[in-house]
Amino acid sequence: MNIQALMQQAQTMQKKVEANVENAKKDLANKEVHAEAGSGLVKVTMTGRHVVKRLTIDPSLLEDEPDMIEDLIAAAINDAVRQADELYETTMAGATSGMGLPPGMQGMF
């Protein structure tokens, strides 16, 4: 195999990876994760791209101390971020699978 053919093969692979990654990013924007804190008193819905779509606070919490509400909101959002990160890793691994990329390179996207 000559160098020109090798370069063309690398270019083709790069375009395919870029297209797959772009499709995966669009897919992540449409997927949602759901998290909660305080046994469901605070609920968060977030996209796979870390956009908070909904935040629900049980009315009973509004009578309590603001510190408790703030802690539960932070916990729910942090859980949603963790789930969105896992969704991202899984989706990107799928987008670049079968491409023969070296280990660790999938996480670069």
Curated annotation (Swiss-Prot):
Taxonomic superkingdom: Bacteria
GO CC terms, sorted: bacterial nucleoid; cytosol
Classification via InterPro entries: YbaB-like_sf, YbaB/EbfC
Major subcellular site: cytoplasm
Location of this chain's protein in the cell: Cytoplasm, Nucleoid
Gene3D superfamilies on file: Nucleoid-associated protein YbaB-like domain (3.30.1310.10)
GO MF annotations in UniProt: DNA binding
HAMAP family: DNA_YbaB_EbfC
Family under the similarity heading: Belongs to the YbaB/EbfC family.
Subunit structure: Homodimer.
Protein name per the record: Nucleoid-associated protein Psyc_0793
Organism: Psychrobacter arcticus (strain DSM 17307 / VKM B-2377 / 273-4)
